[in-house]
Design a protein with these regions (language model features):
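N-terminal subdomain of lithium-sensitive/metallo-dependent phosphomonoesterases centered on the IMPase/IPPase/PAP
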Residues: 1-43
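DPxDG-like acidic metal-binding loop motif
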Residues: 32-87
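ATP-dependent small-molecule kinase catalytic core of the GHMP/sugar-kinase superfamily
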Residues: 76-107
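An extended, acidic
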Residues: 99-177, 181
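Residue-level signal for inorganic ion chemistry
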Residues: 2, 13, 46, 75, ...
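N-terminal low-complexity segments that are often proline-rich with Ser/Thr-Pro
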Residues: 184-185
Length: 185
């Protein structure tokens, strides 16, 4: 499903744009990208998708000089289209404005995280992770960084934190959730 989705998205973008495309499945050398390029994750949450867990999506973004400028995340299980851009500083779900949470106290906030396959499970690493997690009201592991971006953009959670993520995993966190707190993500 990933490769079919990616090929379709690349075909559509290429018919309308000459900018290069960085895609999860086919990749592209960062040397070949230039200052402006598209980023595609054709199926974020593949493991969820493969097990019929309805937490997965398609994400597409435009990056200029390594800064996310605009993008969309399509949560096809719920027919929710999230969009955002740095020019308007407005995030939307199905053309309705959404807002990030105003909570700033971790004790009242939700952290979304994950444990990728290359996670360091040493005692010291796990102790540090547990210590950090104890500061939050709730911890959620949902299996999709892009869906996490949607939850943050719509105020359902306050922060996403995970090591080992790639650009196509996290670029949507920054442009679907424009806020003064972008630097915290």
């Amino acid at each position: 499903a990933d490769i079919e989705s990616e090929n379709l998205i690349k075909s559509i973008i290429s018919s309308e744009s000459t900018y290069p495309i960085l895609a999860e499945e086919s990749g592209k050398s960062s040397n070949d990208l230039g200052d402006v390029f598209w980023v595609i994750d054709p199926l974020d949450g593949t493991s969820n998708y493969n097990r019929d867990i309805p937490i997965c999506c398609v994400s597409i973004g435009l990056v200029i000089e390594m800064k996310p400028i605009l993008g969309i995340i399509y949560d096809f299980n719920n027919d929710h289209m999230y969009s955002g851009d740095k020019f308007s500083n407005i995030s939307k779900m199905n053309d309705i404005s959404i807002n990030v949470s105003q909570k700033s106290d971790k004790k009242e906030s939700i952290l979304i995280t994950g444990l990728p396959h290359n996670t360091d499970y040493s005692d010291s690493s796990l102790n540090n992770m547990i210590k950090d997690m104890q500061d939050w009201q709730k911890i959620r592991m949902i299996g999709s960084a892009a869906i996490a971006a949607c939850y943050i953009a719509s105020g359902k959670a306050e922060r996403y934190q995970e090591t080992g993520s790639y650009l196509w995993d996290i670029v949507c966190l920054l442009y679907t959730s424009p806020s003064p707190r972008d630097d915290e993500l």
